[in-house]
C-alpha cells in the first residue's frame, strides 16, 4: 500500500498569508512537484477548517457572518434589539410552552404570561477565524463570495493545472454551528 497523492492544506501556524501571491506560488510549486513524482495533487479550499470563510476574508463583511436566532425574557420596557424578530407573550406548563402570541409591547401581557423578545445575533469574532467568524452558509452571496475568493482565485492563478496536475478541490464541513459557538452553555438557554 502506498500513497497516491496529497492534499495541499493550510494548517494552524501558517506563516505565509493565506491566498496571497506567495501562497499561490507555493501551492502551484507543490502541485507541480507532486505531478513530477507521479503523485496526484488535490487542494483544500480553506485556511484550516471548516470551509466557507477563505481564512476570514469572506466574513470581513458583517452581512456574510454566521448568525443565529436568540431570545431573552423581559419584565419591563426594553430597548428594541437591532435585529428584532418579534415580541411574544408565553404561558408555560412546567418547561413546555402551553400558549404563545405575538404582542406589540410588554404592557400587552396578561397576568399569567411571560414576555420574550426574539432577535438574531451574529457569531462573535474568534481567533480561529483570523479575528472574524464562520460564514452564513445559507446566504447565497456569502457562498458566492467564498467561491470567488478561493476556487476562482486558484483557477485564475493556475487554471491550466486543473485536470491533469490538480485533480480536484476538497471542501469540508460546511456547517458546524451551534455545537462550537456556545450552544448549551449557561446563560444561552432558557432557565424555565
Per-segment meaning from a language model:
Residues 1-11, 15:
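N-terminal cofactor/phosphate-binding cores enriched in small/glycine residues
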Residues 1, 19-192:
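Mature extracytoplasmic enzyme cores
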Amino acid at each position: 500500500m502506498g500513497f497516491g497523492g496529497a492534499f495541499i492544506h493550510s494548517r494552524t501556524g501558517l506563516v505565509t498569508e493565506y491566498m496571497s501571491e506567495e501562497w499561490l506560488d507555493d501551492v502551484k510549486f507543490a502541485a507541480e512537484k507532486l505531478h513530477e513524482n507521479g503523485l496526484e495533487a488535490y487542494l483544500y479550499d480553506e485556511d484550516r477548517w471548516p470551509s466557507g470563510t477563505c481564512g476570514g476574508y469572506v466574513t470581513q463583511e458583517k452581512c456574510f457572518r454566521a448568525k443565529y436566532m436568540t431570545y431573552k425574557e423581559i419584565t419591563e420596557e426594553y430597548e428594541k434589539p437591532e435585529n428584532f424578530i418579534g415580541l411574544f407573550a408565553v404561558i408555560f406548563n412546567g418547561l413546555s410552552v402551553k400558549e404563545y402570541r405575538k404582542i406589540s409591547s410588554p404592557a400587552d401581557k396578561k397576568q399569567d404570561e411571560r414576555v420574550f423578545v426574539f432577535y438574531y445575533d451574529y457569531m462573535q469574532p474568534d481567533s480561529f477565524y483570523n479575528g472574524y467568524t464562520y460564514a452564513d452558509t445559507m446566504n447565497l452571496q456569502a457562498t458566492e463570495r467564498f467561491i470567488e475568493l478561493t476556487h476562482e482565485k486558484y483557477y485564475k492563478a493556475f487554471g491550466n493545472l486543473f485536470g491533469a496536475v490538480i485533480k480536484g478541490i476538497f471542501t469540508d464541513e460546511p456547517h458546524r454551528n451551534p455545537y462550537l459557538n456556545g450552544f448549551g452553555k449557561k446563560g444561552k438557554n432558557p432557565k424555565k
